[in-house]
């Protein structure tokens, strides 16, 4: 079962739908509706941290979940979840040079992890005004994808199964979103 932590964002349900279409059993819980003990009792096999309209500091249990389950369970962070992943390990989340709300843009990636087998460059949909500051990215992460302006669009932990994407693979305008999520689901 995938535990999908909802950071009060409607895109959470797009992620839910995509994972269900891929055959996953998914349980959605709001970021303020469960504890780490509750999660232990649920015994998820994977965790997804959803997008949201706030900063990682305002994302309920999301930061604690990443810190607690890093190295224990595979975790995928999407948009806010991606930012929370970097911040949980000491990275800084800052205002983006340009607000991207409902905009598509090409990204380049390294072809590994969730990007395995995907087009390169890949057109994705972005809904964010914050980004991970490149100079602050903890050394335990590799940058796996970047925009034309070199903003970080994907990260992966060097040792543990933690991966984040700044964009929205669950948006209908993103290319190969199902495949990206399948790459996370089936590893």
From Swiss-Prot:
One of its GO terms (biological process) is tetrahydrofolate biosynthetic process. It catalyses: chorismate + L-glutamine = 4-amino-4-deoxychorismate + L-glutamate. The keyword Transferase applies. Transmembrane segments: none annotated. Keywords: Folate biosynthesis, Glutamine amidotransferase, Transferase. Residues 1-187 form the Glutamine amidotransferase type-1 domain. Pathway: Cofactor biosynthesis; tetrahydrofolate biosynthesis; 4-aminobenzoate from chorismate: step 1/2. GO terms for molecular function: 4-amino-4-deoxychorismate synthase activity; protein heterodimerization activity. Disruption phenotype: Cells lacking this gene do not produce 4-aminobenzoate. The active site is at residues 79, 168, 170. This is Aminodeoxychorismate synthase component 2. It comes from Escherichia coli (strain K12).
